[in-house]
Amino acid sequence: MKRTTCWLLVGTVLLSLCCCAPAVPASAELTPEQTPSAPTAAALTPAPTAIPTPSPTPMPTPTATPVPTDTPEPTPPPTPTPEPRPLVEIVEEMAVYYARDGEKALGKVEELLGEMAAAYPDDAQRWAKIMDRWRTLDERIAVNIGVLPDGLPDTDELCIVVLGYKLKSNGSMQNHLRDRLNVALKCAKKYPNAYVLCTGGGTASKKKSATEAGQMSSWLKKKGVSKQRVLVEKASRTTAQNARLSMEMLCRDHPEVKYIAIVSGDYHIKAATLFFEAEAILRTAPGDEPAITVIANAACRTSNQDQSARYRAGGLVELAGNSQAASDLTHDRYDMKKYPPLP
């Protein structure tokens, strides 16, 4: 009974102490020693996490759809232009055709001149004139026997060109060359103010120092022709070279000379005239007249026939620059069937 009463007394005291304790203001901060009050429901609810707003994705720029058009056909590559043939080859073919076929070859000659004009227009004009001189040679050129005709200029504008002839092996002159010189002497006396040009190189097999021109000039001087009038060209070995080197000398050293008269054997006059005319044309600008003109000839008489068409072709081919083909044509070694027959 006493023990029960004691426990009741203790409980009563504790209850009274709790009821008498002062209340803590709501606004007062809790000290570390104080026990925190129970959290509210709001405090227990976590704050919502902010969700980042995505940046707007830029809309792609619309690409214009190409409107189909008519596509032109690709241009094919140009056909390569073939290299033109060398001029000398065209001249050779042209000369051989005309020498072989004569008037029948005129169409072929025109065709070859057209080919030449496409690549060498200035040369084509010159060679057209040369071929015309060849075609009309026989009807244009009359051979004067013994002396030059009357009416030529008796001034230093005229040059009498004496063509050489092969020397004997010891360097002396053959009779035919003396015959040419006798004609040249008559011409020099008839036109005493004209130059006399001797042309021809070394052709003596046993005396290399002897030249046709040297022998001729010595002979003329001994016969009374003034040395101031006598000109010497002693490097040429063919008639085509006679023409080229003589023209070169006159144009270079004697620009006063405007006309030449050729002295040779009768069979040789026409071919020589053609070569000198051709060389004069080749030295002339297209559209101009040659600086030197062949105006006359004089010849010693022989029993020989005129030089062949092959010989004439050979001289022109040599003037064009092909000495080997020229030699073959001149000495009848050339294959005249080299080019196809004409229809």
Predicted regions and their residues:
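Bacterial N-terminal signal peptides that target proteins for export
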Residues: 1-8
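Bacterial N-terminal signal peptides
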Residues: 9-18
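Ser/Thr-rich, Proline-interspersed low-complexity disordered segments
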Residues: 19-83
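Extended hydrophobic blocks
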Residues: 78-159, 244-343
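Histidine-anchored nucleotide/phosphate-binding helix
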Residues: 174-193
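A non-catalytic structural micro-motif
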Residues: 195-197, 217-235, 281-304
